[in-house]
Every structure is written in C-alpha cells, then in structure tokens.
Amino acid sequence: IGKQKEPISGERVQSMLYNHMQERSAVADALLPSRNVGIVWNGAGALPYSTWAVGVFNDWLDADEDIDESATQYIGRLTWAPLRTDDDSSLLHLGIGYRYSNAKGGFRFRTEPEFNQAPAYVDTGFDVPTGILPANNIQTVNAEISWRRGPLWLASEYTQTAVDNPDLSHPTFNGYWIGASWVLTGEMRPYSKKSGTFRGVPVAKSVYQGGKGAWELSARWSSIDLSDGTVEGGDMDIASLGVSWWLSPIFSINMNYRYIWNTRLGVEGSSSGFNSRLLLLLE
C-alpha cells in the first residue's frame, strides 16, 4: 500500500539501476507510468517460476484532488519462465501485462529521446493549449520476452495503448524495444522467480580485491509512434550502444551513445548524443 511501481512491464518493475542501458526505453517512459498511489497484491503462480500481480491505483495525492476526481487504474501482470536448465544458466522469460484507466482528467503522452535532460521529441499534446486531450478510457497491453544464457542476455517488449475518444478517431499508440547485453567478464544476470525480473550484473571480483570488476557491452533499438487518428504526436526511432564497468557491486562507470530519428507533422530530423555516468549505490 502506498506510492509504488505499477505492476506492468519487466523494464518498469525492475530497478532502473539494473537496466542494460542508462535510461528506460522511450515507449516505457511515454506509455507506462513509473510510480503511483495504490494497492498491489502479488504472489507465485500455479506453475514453477511463474508470478502474478494485480493492483488498483489513483493519483489523487500527486494531483492534489479528491479520489473521485482523479483517474483510477486497474493493472495486472503475469510472468512465467517455461524453459530453463537445472542450474538456471539458460532461461526463457515471458510476461504479459494489462492496464485500464478511466482517464479522468484526460491524457498526454510524451517522452525525451532517452536522455533524461533532453526536451520531449514526441508529444501528443504539443499543439494543445493545455497539453491535455480528453478520453473516455485508456487501455494498455504490454508483452515481454527475455532469454538469458550465461553472460548473454536478449530481451524485448511491446506496448500498445488504445484511447477511447471518437472525436480523436480512437487513436492507438504503440512502441517496442529490442535489447542485448554481453558480460565480457563472464558474470550472469540473476533471475528473480519471485518478481519475474532480472537483476543487475554481479561482480565476481572487484578491482579493490585485485580483480577486473565486471564489464558489460549493450545495445538497444527502440521505436515509438504517437501519431494516430487525429493526434499527431510524432514518431521516433533510437539506436543505442553502451558499455558499463562495475568496479565493485556498488560503483560503476558507464557510457551510452544514441542516434535518434524523429518525424512529426511530416518534418523529419535526426540527432545524436553521448552520455557518461558515475553510479554509486548507497544502502
């Protein structure tokens, strides 16, 4: 109970500190809210390595409104790892999530090009005075798949959001990402069968113990389309490359390069950027 992550999307549920790239994908930031005020129930499924989670949320606290004036969301997620070796060194993960919102207060979907301090490149409300568009309800479906074999990890997610508003021609927005990472030093991302998520790269021997730490190479392609019906929010594709060096389990140096293709109202453009980050975990 409280302000917490909504149970949808493995990328959203797991800590961003353990993502293979510095920032979450554009589609996750645009269509899948991070934290909300609500109640979540979760547990192990009937099958081995399966989980379930359901939640009810209402953002009245952040919006400073009465509960009956703010949007209410009903959310659920199911995961299962149907294929795995006895030692879990090879594992296939599947997940599906659903989100329903009564959309009180309307909607606005937007996101930056996977650089936290950049402006929004796609935005459903950029040409609306208030930025907010009305809707009767909003339904979102998310599908996830991941495969890990030793130090190799491949993953992908697809998200689709349907808006019920005949005046906007019932627009549907969608996006996906495909990612991969390879831990050069041989460590393997652990899998949590309790939450149905992958955790961060462990460090076999830190540099402070005379080791090399853990080195990870990563790549991702992401795409989002916020133009449909009468809404022209634009579309964006992003290619990303990254390298991370975990000197110890709590300290890392990582660098990401991204190339972005962006189209809105028939105007096409491209840009690129490089970002470095020092990460220190304090517990």
What function would you assign to each model-found segment?
Residues 3, 90, 98, 108-283:
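Outer-membrane beta-barrel pore domains
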Residues 1-104, 173-209, 216-229:
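Outer membrane beta-barrel
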